[in-house]
Amino acid sequence: MPVITLPDGSQRQFDRAVSPMDVALDIGPGLAKATIAGRVNGELVDASDLIENDAQLSIITAKDAEGIEIIRHSCAHLLGHAIKQLWPNTKMAIGPVIDNGFYYDVDLDHTLTQEDIDALEKRMHELAETNYDVIKKNVSWHEARETFVKRGENYKVSILDENISHDDKPGLYHHEEYVDMCRGPHVPNMRFCHHFKLMKIAGAYWRGDSNNKMLQRIYGTAWADKKALNAYLVRLEEAAKRDHRKIGKQLDLYHMQEEAPGMVFWHNDGWTIFRELETFVRSKLKEYQYQEVKGPFMMDRVLWEKTGHWDNYKDAMFTTSSENREYCIKPMNCPGHVQIFNQGLKSYRDLPLRMAEFGSCHRNEPSGALHGLMRVRGFTQDDAHIFCTEGQVRDEVNACIRMVYDMYSTFGFEKIVVKLSTRPEKRIGSDETWDRAEADLAVALEENNIPFEYQLGEGAFYGPKIEFTLYDCLDRAWQCGTVQLDFSLPQRLSASYVGEDNERQIPVMIHRAILGSIERFIGILTEEFAGFFPTWLAPVQVVVMNITDSQADYVKELTQKLQNAGIRVKADLRNEKIGFKIREHTLRRVPYMLVCGDKEVESGKVAVRTRRGKDLGSLDVNEVIEKLRLEIRSRSLQQLEV
């Protein structure tokens, strides 16, 4: 007679084993109709799974994040159902949930076209609209294998042979005549799976191994209702308009080419943005009392063997040879910073020592994963490492957190999700050390009133970490900032200081990045601002233009005055209509356009327009310059009412 405890603390007693659906029905028919699955003692289960003992139960509906994820997973099965009806010889591989959707890898004897995808989506809708029940059966490993052997599903057989224990009872989900295998849970009925869209096709190797067959990956998105689906599609459309690759070309910021895959060719305007970001970061380094250093971009392989990078990371490292020595081009900056720390005897009085670098790093990312500025092989990190005593960790982490929020707020990022990753099973250091380290990170977050969630067991083997994920205006997540404790690297590279007891001590090392890759951060900002960079970041901040040749000297004089005030300015003296010039510079997202006609020459003023089309009228030149300098100096996100 199980007693079921609900989230509000109320209890219901039953005289038999019950499923989450039974409990929902006992509460009311409305809840039963909305039930997708259950969470029993913290574990997600199907709505039909039986609960035999006392348990805590939460009913999962489409209002829950888990409910949406289950809908997406079931839409992957729906895709399988439809594709087997259209092309019965298709072999099904894997169909997991991903952010905002799902995919299915399929082995098909022809290359899918857009017409095929349209037909597939249509068949999926036809099937879903019959609102058939999804039937789950847990069977023996042997029965599952026999089922898929009979159906010719060699990829499912391979999964059973290589990934599932013979003692397990795999879940087989029956979608009418179609059968799929999954841990689940899945929707109990296809009425939950009406709001989806197939998005694109890509290639994917079976098990991610290029030695295996290339499969076709069909991507889709699915939501709880039509409104949410349409809102997502609108966001995608907006994201396409904001694509940094498209805007980067339009604004002549950078380019990439085949001869240097994953490496950026910065053009003048893009490099201006890059240098402005460096200047901004440097101002914060000074404020938070960091040294700035510069390490070599390659070091002997022997050093990387000492650090452990060679054993764990060599596939991602570029190497070169000279005079019978092998060198690794650095994928990260930390070993170099330890070498700088090791020069000269250090005392506890020298700590904390905060060391920052705009470190040029290279990683051998797979060519298929490269994506504009977001995923590159050559990048610059705003990297820092803090060497401190165990007793200083909390204060240093506290300062790092303040610095992270200080810098992100400058760009207008307000929604930041924070996760604290704790000790994994395989780790170095004592439990006492980990207890203190994890507590230091948690307390530092709490002292800054920052809500966070734990990622249990997700820390590195050498220490716990805090991850900062910022959300942009389209609610996309970008993991940028990290504060990572490291108990290993200083020990591996013999870093030490003399403690108060005159004994040799090993410092704690804190890895700290805020923007992460500057290249990637510029990509994020380009999409966040849709190319309308705040004035302080804009490559060209002001364009001064004449209406006729008679104002040319006045334009030159005004341009020089703006340059002398430290403003990035260009003069446009072309023999073109003023409307043409304004349109062109508006498309180039120049924050301010100053127009000079005869009236402005006579009055010593200038007509001011913003890139958003706002006419601010004819204003005193010195007032305009002072207001612009204030806007730039304060790194304002808003254009001032000059």
Swiss-Prot record:
Q: Where is this region: Catalytic?
A: 243-534
Superkingdom to which the source organism belongs: Bacteria
Which Gene Ontology molecular function entries are recorded, alphabetically?
Answer: ATP binding; metal ion binding; threonine-tRNA ligase activity; tRNA binding
Predominant localisation class = cytoplasm
Quaternary structure note: Homodimer.
Q: What does this protein do?
A: Catalyzes the attachment of threonine to tRNA(Thr) in a two-step reaction: L-threonine is first activated by ATP to form Thr-AMP and then transferred to the acceptor end of tRNA(Thr). Also edits incorrectly charged L-seryl-tRNA(Thr).
Q: What is this protein called?
A: Threonine--tRNA ligase
Query: What is the organism field in this record?
Result: Enterobacter sp. (strain 638)
Q: Gene name?
A: thrS
